[in-house]
Amino acid sequence: MAEAHKYKKLTPIEHVLTRPEMYIGSLDTTATPMFIYDEQKGHMVWETVKLNHGLLKIVDEILLNASDNISNRSARMTYIRVTITDTGEITIENDGAGIPIVRSREHKLYIPEMVFGHLLTSSNYDDDNQNAVAGRHGYGAKLTNILSLSFSVCCRTNGREFHMSWQDHMRKATAPRVSNVGTKEKNVTRVKFLPDYERFGMKEKKISNDMKRVLYKRIMDLSAMFPNIQITLNGSSFGFKSFKDYATLYSAMTPKGEKPPPPYVYESKSGCVAFIPSVVPGVRRMFGVVNGVVTYNGGTHCNAAQDILTGCLDGVERELKKENKVMDTNRVLRHFTILVFLVQVQPKFDSQNKARLVSTPTMPRVPRQDVMKYLLRMPFLEAHVSTITGQLAQELNKEIGTGRRMSSKTLLTSITKLVDATSTRRDPKHTRTLIVTEGDSAKALAQNSLSSDQKRYTGVFPLRGKLLNVRNKNLKRLRNCKELQELFCALGLELDKDYTDADELRYQRILIMTDQDADGSHIKGLVINAFESLWPSLLVRNPGFISIFSTPIVKARLRDKSVVSFFSMKEFHKWQRSNANTPYTCKYYKGLGTSTTAEGKEYFKDMEKHTMRLLVDRSDHKLLDNVFDSQEVEWRKDWMTKANAFTGEVDIDRSKKMLTVTDFVHKEMVHFALVGNARALAHSVDGLKPSQRKIIWALMRRSGNEAAKVAQLSGYISEASAFHHGETSLQETMIKMAQSFTGGNNVNLLVPEGQFGSRQQLGNDHAAPRYIFTKLSKVARLLFPSEDDPLLDYIVEEGQQVEPNHYVPILPLLLCNGSVGIGFGFSSNIPPFHRLDVSAAVRAMISGERAKSVVRRLVPWAVGFQGEIRRGPEGEFIAVGTYTYCKGGRVHVTELPWTCSVEAFREHISYLATKDIVNRIADYSGANHVDIDVEVAQGAVNTYAECESELGLTQRIHINGTVFSPNGTLSPLESDLTPVLQWHYDRRLDLYKKRRQRNLTLLEQELAREKSTLKFVQHFGAGHIDFANATEATLEKVCSKLGLVRVDDSFDYILRKPITFYTKTSFENLLKKIAETERRIEALKKTTPVQLWLGELDQFDRFFQDHEKKMVEAILKERRQRSPPSDLLPGLQQPRLEVEEAKGGKKFEMRVQVRKYVPPPTKRGAGGRSDGDGGATAAGAAAAVGGRGEKKGPGRAGGVRRMVLDALAKRVTRLLPRLLF
């Protein structure tokens, strides 16, 4: 009970006075750089002034009350008058609608008395009201009253006048005086107050000169926001006729007297945006106002305005690229100051301070073309624009432009993989051709198949590795692409040369020879893109300079030993349909390496038969820009979304000898794009990518489920499922599917036996595939019941049935495990959710709740995570690690966001150590638990929010989903996962209906067979069948006569029984079996599809409840015990924030709950207000010996002295807590 006196309950007024920083910011005066108006220079300057945020805020609250009255259209407002006396008394008066002078029926108080003298009174609580005002929380003017020595108000509204005054920080008040005045008297609201300057640290008890300048600038900002209202300070107006007048004040001459260009200003009803250029580059600065509120910390509106400018600069950059120029956008941005003044409906700020806008702004529709034209006129732009035909192009020409003049010997030594044509003489009968192959195996096929005569005028060059996209003449990227450099060198090309024909090159044609798959299409596209980007005239003026060599993808061998070749799967399938009764065997040629040398000789025997000439038109430049330019993301998204659902087929007629760029892009490149997305993006129903689906399917059909090495299993899976993309990628996929640590998989479909990775590196620390074992986990068959298998739609590859198009698990696995993937133009980042919450979501759907309502209650989570999920300022989710802050600066970190590895955290701490924020780290973490001690430097963090931010203990969780819908089309979901839940629910319920009907049919067929068998046995037992003299024909006649059921058009299931089947024991067993089958049929008839689903969900839930319990126990067992409460600093501990109330769905509550957003606290002492805190004592000791705050002395001696004092301060800081406690 001795500690009871420490606990106090404060009144609201006492709380504001005791903790004012929670409401208005710091009361301390600090040196703050900001825009300020310089009366002598007549324009704005960026200057450091002594600013008191709290004093500015209480004045601002009354100013904003006045400006909010502008939106009240019941009476026109014409002026706001501000007066500041020498003693510091401030008066703010405005006309307009005024405050109603009536008593509240509910509270029996006059409305002005409530508005100015009772906390939490406001007229802005109606969120349906579309007024653009600054007030929101009901504190405003009351905070000014509480923090003032005197406060009085006079309201004159509609013929009545109200007077009332307060003293002693709103604790004492006079009685309200109400009188009648003439109805013609103008409405007025006048507030007069004297701030408690001493409380704001101003010993002279009056306003400082710097604060007068700050308030002058603040009132000037308000005048710019509302130029139609006469706003004056001490009787003087600012004279702004428009926002442009105000924006011009930010333009300043250089020290050399250079005049800056005029600002770009755009004004609209929703606000104004200005881009103010400066001749000399500086630091990027932005200044924003929302409904009169100056957002000193920026916010979403400032970011949006900068995005507009950046987007326009990007547009300028694209235009310059067409002129063979490049621009340094970041350097150009440093020339601009951005102003954004917005009028917003119901704006949301990060706190009562309103220093940062967090809601999505409605920006003025700035005409971007006008801004681009404006930017192109900037005189400083030229300094940041350069041609790419400068030094880099010259250096590259030295490497790739001298090939034409190189001797064969020089080429032999410089490009070792080039097999050059054996003759250098030109033959008019034959075009000198360079065959460009995909890899060495294709090179071998070409080289081994060419005849001796063909080798005289044909060279071969293999492309190894991935080519780079050099669109827009990106020579920096070209410099990093050795493959293209050597190709251009072999051809003898020179950069920036306009070729009229190809005769001056070493080869007059290149023939691209790649695999007939999506990767081959990509290589063709990159080669075409490189030549069209760097030498467009060469392709336009020389049709067929780039040609495509096609080889069969399928060969069908008929009974007469004739062979039919097919160059596309579409062509093959068409032939199959028209020759359905023709017997044949087929061979698939996915890669060029499949072809034999004999087949290769056959191809090259008639080379032109297999060659398609590429025709390029000047208009194709724009189309290739859309496909390969990094800026054209939206076009590519639209391109692929409009494409048909992925079928795995290329729709190009290979019989034609000409191929246009348009056909290539829309029929072959789109094939690569869709295949790439199919590999990278998950299916909405089963949450799997094709490689994962192949692994599951192959392991399910594997006999037995014994663990095997990952390296061995990859070979089996690759063969069984017709996987064509290398066993290494398959092994990596298997390892990821087996990872079960926090942040790995919430549901691991494979079992990890060995080192499959840990939280140390988020799985990247796994052992080699040849050392680790895996097998299918038990949960796989819980999610994918074997009874589903016959009802799924399977893919046919190379003539064999492989994995399903997609599985239909009992839960949407995409929500359980999440999915991350980067495709072609699309990406996906879906976080995982608690698997039992996903189960509860499905149950809620079954009970009739709408998917949208259910998804709103789902909160991201990783199994084993010991932290919490908070709501962010913009409604997003934030994963937060856990720590305890101990005396002496020791921070015991016990959890990290699951997307942060322990190693990444250690690297971050190492960086903080270089900044003197952290002194040391002790890591006790294991494979799946976090246990780290960090010693933080004294004074480095002052609030829990700073501690979380500095140590990197928070991580925003982004939801941006693009998935394949049930019908196979790309479906961008953005942040709404409702379709995933709905699609899965529809498909799974439909599958249960089909499964129930199928099982019922199978049971009825089984019962008919059993009853037929019983009837035959009874007939035999009665002596009606003489087996000794019967033939098969007579027995079949007996069965037919008895009306027995046939199976596969025979009675073998009865007639092939062993003699022991006719014993009494077998007869009794048969009767029992029939009774059991009848019972199962009746039970299944009474069971609905929903009941089947719920039964399987129950099994899943029981399995994972036990699994999670064991996992959490193991984590807690490994971790060290927490520090005792006596060692903790209360002021720096993480708060237990209030849980958001879930809307609807009370029947199915979620395990994971999100905590409400609370604005981060402002700075305060590390140890709170307690005098006994070790942190506070250490800070005082550090200050006593010099510490961080001491100014540097002059010269070398001062620097040495400071180093000694700093070292001494650190030692005292570490030792004092041990001595005192």
Curated annotation (Swiss-Prot):
<dbReference type="InterPro" id="IPR006171">
    <property type="entry name" value="TOPRIM_dom"/>
</dbReference>
<dbReference type="InterPro" id="IPR050634">
    <property type="entry name" value="DNA_Topoisomerase_II"/>
</dbReference>
<dbReference type="GO" id="GO:0003677">
    <property type="term" value="F:DNA binding"/>
</dbReference>
<feature type="binding site">
    <location>
        <position position="438"/>
    </location>
    <ligand>
        <name>Mg(2+) 1</name>
    </ligand>
</feature>
<feature type="binding site">
    <location>
        <position position="515"/>
    </location>
    <ligand>
        <name>Mg(2+) 1</name>
    </ligand>
</feature>
<comment type="similarity">
    <text>Belongs to the type II topoisomerase family.</text>
</comment>
<feature type="region of interest" description="Disordered">
    <location>
        <begin position="1158"/>
        <end position="1198"/>
    </location>
</feature>
<dbReference type="InterPro" id="IPR013760">
    <property type="entry name" value="Topo_IIA-like_dom_sf"/>
</dbReference>
<feature type="domain" description="Toprim">
    <location>
        <begin position="432"/>
        <end position="546"/>
    </location>
</feature>
<feature type="binding site">
    <location>
        <position position="515"/>
    </location>
    <ligand>
        <name>Mg(2+) 2</name>
    </ligand>
</feature>
<keyword id="KW-0539">Nucleus</keyword>
<feature type="binding site">
    <location>
        <position position="94"/>
    </location>
    <ligand>
        <name>ATP</name>
    </ligand>
</feature>
<dbReference type="GO" id="GO:0006265">
    <property type="term" value="P:DNA topological change"/>
</dbReference>
<feature type="site" description="Transition state stabilizer">
    <location>
        <position position="770"/>
    </location>
</feature>
<feature type="site" description="Interaction with DNA">
    <location>
        <position position="636"/>
    </location>
</feature>
<dbReference type="InterPro" id="IPR013759">
    <property type="entry name" value="Topo_IIA_B_C"/>
</dbReference>
<feature type="binding site">
    <location>
        <begin position="352"/>
        <end position="354"/>
    </location>
    <ligand>
        <name>ATP</name>
    </ligand>
</feature>
<feature type="site" description="Interaction with DNA">
    <location>
        <position position="637"/>
    </location>
</feature>
<dbReference type="GO" id="GO:0000712">
    <property type="term" value="P:resolution of meiotic recombination intermediates"/>
</dbReference>
<protein>
    <recommendedName>
        <fullName>DNA topoisomerase 2</fullName>
        <ecNumber>5.6.2.2</ecNumber>
    </recommendedName>
</protein>
<feature type="site" description="Important for DNA bending; intercalates between base pairs of target DNA">
    <location>
        <position position="822"/>
    </location>
</feature>
<feature type="binding site">
    <location>
        <begin position="135"/>
        <end position="142"/>
    </location>
    <ligand>
        <name>ATP</name>
    </ligand>
</feature>
<feature type="site" description="Interaction with DNA">
    <location>
        <position position="466"/>
    </location>
</feature>
<dbReference type="InterPro" id="IPR013757">
    <property type="entry name" value="Topo_IIA_A_a_sf"/>
</dbReference>
<dbReference type="InterPro" id="IPR031660">
    <property type="entry name" value="TOPRIM_C"/>
</dbReference>
<dbReference type="GO" id="GO:0020023">
    <property type="term" value="C:kinetoplast"/>
</dbReference>
<dbReference type="InterPro" id="IPR034157">
    <property type="entry name" value="TOPRIM_TopoII"/>
</dbReference>
<comment type="function">
    <text>Control of topological states of DNA by transient breakage and subsequent rejoining of DNA strands. Topoisomerase II makes double-strand breaks.</text>
</comment>
<dbReference type="InterPro" id="IPR001154">
    <property type="entry name" value="TopoII_euk"/>
</dbReference>
<feature type="binding site">
    <location>
        <position position="65"/>
    </location>
    <ligand>
        <name>ATP</name>
    </ligand>
</feature>
<keyword id="KW-0479">Metal-binding</keyword>
<keyword id="KW-0238">DNA-binding</keyword>
<dbReference type="InterPro" id="IPR001241">
    <property type="entry name" value="Topo_IIA"/>
</dbReference>
<dbReference type="GO" id="GO:0005634">
    <property type="term" value="C:nucleus"/>
</dbReference>
<dbReference type="Pfam" id="PF16898">
    <property type="entry name" value="TOPRIM_C"/>
</dbReference>
<feature type="domain" description="Topo IIA-type catalytic">
    <location>
        <begin position="681"/>
        <end position="1097"/>
    </location>
</feature>
<dbReference type="InterPro" id="IPR014721">
    <property type="entry name" value="Ribsml_uS5_D2-typ_fold_subgr"/>
</dbReference>
<dbReference type="InterPro" id="IPR020568">
    <property type="entry name" value="Ribosomal_Su5_D2-typ_SF"/>
</dbReference>
<keyword id="KW-0413">Isomerase</keyword>
<dbReference type="Pfam" id="PF00521">
    <property type="entry name" value="DNA_topoisoIV"/>
</dbReference>
<dbReference type="InterPro" id="IPR013758">
    <property type="entry name" value="Topo_IIA_A/C_ab"/>
</dbReference>
<feature type="active site" description="O-(5'-phospho-DNA)-tyrosine intermediate">
    <location>
        <position position="771"/>
    </location>
</feature>
